[in-house]
Regions:
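Membrane-interface capping segments at transmembrane-helix boundaries
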Residues: 149-160, 314-329
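Juxtamembrane helix-loop boundaries in multi-pass membrane proteins
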Residues: 32-37, 91-101, 170-185, 294-303
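Internal helix-turn-beta structural module
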Residues: 276-316
Length: 331
């Protein structure tokens, strides 16, 4: 929520989706806390609400009614769909709701297009802020590191090493398993690494890239650490040497940051597979967005889900074949 408030989300376009999730929880007589995280991630579809409000051919009250109705429906269908698609990639894509949001966005945008309503994307990309924002971010990360050692004491290093040993598959909770101090340290290290990586490849620090960096920081409490995000990011970087785009361009630099949704693949299967996942993700992420015209802010969550569903069964089949071969059992 915080990161994407820098590009795409605001106080007006998120509430209908959140209310839809609340209605779903109330309908099933479940506590809202069970679905609140889906509601937060589901606000990735908030541009749809804004887009409907800008259909100038319709009266204002009708636009307001339609946007609220669509937002409520999106929020209502998100929980069951997100639960269902999780079984497809088995937690190897951390942005699970981004995958389900991509499916919903595809359906909604297709319906809008069938009524002659089209969406036009535009690029607003700020430049020249690197020195100021880098200084601010460095101060933040240094403060987090100091706070981690100040409140965590000598055990921070041990707990952090335990984090580094985790694969990071969806559902991991570093705060619960390793404590707040080690988690804050992990967040600071990942944030600093991502920031330096962006600047190192010639990228710009602005709203979208800060959103990507803060997303990495946020998910450093649940799945990401430097050992499993680095291979994915380097995979995207290596892809830029062979493909027809430059890594510092807006879409590729965002794909670089958000590709870390596939961190569990590198954490579970190793560096080489992580590099391959990043390589594939860069291609998928830069091409699937055309389906829903940018209406899903978590485009890389959708792309990451596709890559995970493609790669994980193949990797498991190879592993099973090797295991059977060692046991002298044929497939």
């Amino acid at each position: 929520m915080f990161g994407f408030s820098l590009f795409g989300k605001n106080l007006l376009n998120i509430w209908a989706i959140l209310l839809g999730v609340y209605i779903y929880a109330h309908y099933h007589k479940m506590h809202l806390s069970r679905y609140v995280y889906i509601g937060f991630y589901g606000t990735s579809l908030s541009p749809i609400i804004t887009q409907i409000m800008y259909i100038t051919d319709l009266p204002y009250l009708l636009r307001l009614f339609i946007s609220l109705a669509v937002g409520l429906m999106i929020g209502f269908v998100l929980p069951p769909l997100s639960t269902h698609v999780h079984y497809a990639h088995k937690g190897y894509s951390l942005y699970n709701v981004g995958f389900s949001a991509g499916i919903i966005a595809t359906v909604v945008v297709s319906v809008l297009k069938s009524f002659g309503i089209t969406t036009e994307s535009r690029l607003i990309w700020s430049e020249g802020n690197n020195q100021l924002l880098f200084a601010v971010l460095c101060c933040l990360f240094v403060a987090m590191i100091i706070a981690a050692f100040l409140f965590g004491g000598k055990e921070v290093g041990t707990s952090y090493r335990k984090i580094l040993s985790c694969s990071g598959i969806g559902g991991t909770d570093y705060l619960r398993d390793n404590g707040g101090a080690a988690t804050v340290l992990n967040m600071a290290i990942n944030g600093l690494f991502a920031t330096i990586f962006v600047l190192g490849v010639g990228g710009e620090l602005n709203g979208p890239t800060l959103g990507g960096i803060f997303t990495i920081i946020g998910f450093s409490a649940t799945g990401k650490h430097i050992r499993n995000i680095a291979p994915i990011m380097f995979g995207v970087l290596f892809a830029s040497f062979t493909k027809h785009w430059t890594i510092s361009s807006p879409s590729p630099i965002l794909a670089l940051l958000f590709s870390t949704t596939l961190a569990p693949i590198a954490g579970e299967f190793g560096i080489f597979v992580g590099l391959l996942a990043g390589f594939l993700h860069s291609s998928v992420a830069l091409n699937v967005g055309i389906v829903y015209g940018g209406m899903n802010l978590y485009n890389n969550g959708f792309a990451g889900g596709i890559v995970a569903i493609f790669m994980v069964p193949v990797i498991h089949s190879i592993r099973d074949r090797r295991a059977r071969a060692k046991g002298e059992i044929s497939l």
